């Protein structure tokens, strides 16, 4: 019997603009509140988020990357509820949980609190995170597992007839489409005949920039994918005061562009040829340092409009982080079902990000070719015209990615 995990993610950002701005003290509070995995793994002894990023980057060094650390960590934590022996230990250690300093119960309570916080109604942007369990009628799930999924992870549960594969796919795809506001449709193209349980985790985020980019300032410019490959992209521009820093140790520049509400997009531009150096230096400590050292600076910011999608078979990636047992015939998932032959055969993760002047999908790049205007005195020009990194943070790292080719 096979257990499938589908992580269905969508990020739409930003849309529109507001008139208020972040005060420096608000950014300082974000640093103090930022969990960067602390909610996921109390007393963490490793950076799961950044280890996973490096594993994905290593597997496809020339491709763009986009994923949600919160969503993947939550899915693994849910799995650990039903895992036993070495299977559970691998998952918890892979997440970085030090069981000598914190309890497994703290992990699940942390996620319960995170779900409640992230799903609170907010002004200026939409953020929802949730889980669902689709179970075949022939499978007996452990009552304790179902109860924990409902109480700790607020999961919806649905009886599903997997023998009717077309009907099961429609049921699951319709649910995913509804939760992602129609952004992800037909997630399942086919369904394994041995499937008996499907766990779904989704996150939806749609935000407005605090100050939008002017469509009239968008212009076609060169983007240097490599020294040999140059593509034309619609480049947005806006002169304003931004949170900014130059990290000389990692040879990169970091700028924070706030959304309405409490979320911020961080864009990291490595110096030429220094992408791998920056990737190797990513850590919770590094991110905290960046946020703490931000200073307001007048910048003329040039940022490409882009849309990238990340789709990953995590059963092929997580073993490099020490999480392998759950994907084999040796898996102990006795806490999910009393069937001895149940294992996770597939763990699918899909994420989409769209960034433009206002977040409207229908907005198109202008066909007019402009030239860069001269920057004002005391205003520094920062042009993202080569591969860069992107974070979306809201007390936690919601999304992390690399834009290799917009």
Curated annotation (Swiss-Prot):
* Consequence of substituting residue 285 to E: Does not change the rate of thrombin or activated protein C/F5 inhibition in the presence or absence of heparin. Slightly reduces the rate of thrombin inhibition in the presence of heparin
The tissues where this chain's protein is expressed are given as: Predominantly expressed in the epithelium of seminal vesicles. Expressed in the proximal tubular epithelium of the kidney. Expressed in the superficial and more differentiated epidermal keratinocytes of the skin. Expressed in megakaryocytes and platelets. Expressed poorly in kidney tumor cells compared to non tumor kidney tissues. Expressed in spermatozoa. Present in very high concentration in seminal plasma. Present in high concentration in plasma, synovial and Graaf follicle fluids. Present in low concentration in breast milk and in amniotic fluids.
GO molecular function annotations of the record: acrosin binding; glycosaminoglycan binding; heparin binding; phosphatidylcholine binding; protease binding; retinoic acid binding; serine-type endopeptidase inhibitor activity
Q: Which residues are removed as the propeptide when the protein matures?
A: 20-25
User: What are the GO cellular component annotations?
Assistant: acrosomal membrane; external side of plasma membrane; extracellular exosome; extracellular region; extracellular space; membrane; platelet alpha granule; platelet dense tubular network
A Pfam family that the UniProt record links to this protein: Serpin
Q: Where is the signal peptide?
A: 1-19
What's the effect of swapping residue 292 to E?
Does not change the rate of thrombin or activated protein C/F5 inhibition in the presence or absence of heparin. Slightly reduces the rate of thrombin inhibition in the presence of heparin
Record comment: activity regulation: Its inhibitory activity is greatly enhanced in the presence of glycosaminoglycans, heparin, thrombomodulin and phospholipids vesicles.
Described function: Heparin-dependent serine protease inhibitor acting in body fluids and secretions. Inactivates serine proteases by binding irreversibly to their serine activation site. Involved in the regulation of intravascular and extravascular proteolytic activities. Plays hemostatic roles in the blood plasma. Acts as a procoagulant and pro-inflammatory factor by inhibiting the anticoagulant activated protein C factor as well as the generation of activated protein C factor by the thrombin/thrombomodulin complex.
According to UniProt, the name of this protein is Plasma serine protease inhibitor
Task: Write down the species.
Answer: Homo sapiens (Human)
Read off the lineage from the record.
Answer: Eukaryota, Metazoa, Chordata, Craniata, Vertebrata
* Gene name as annotated: SERPINA5
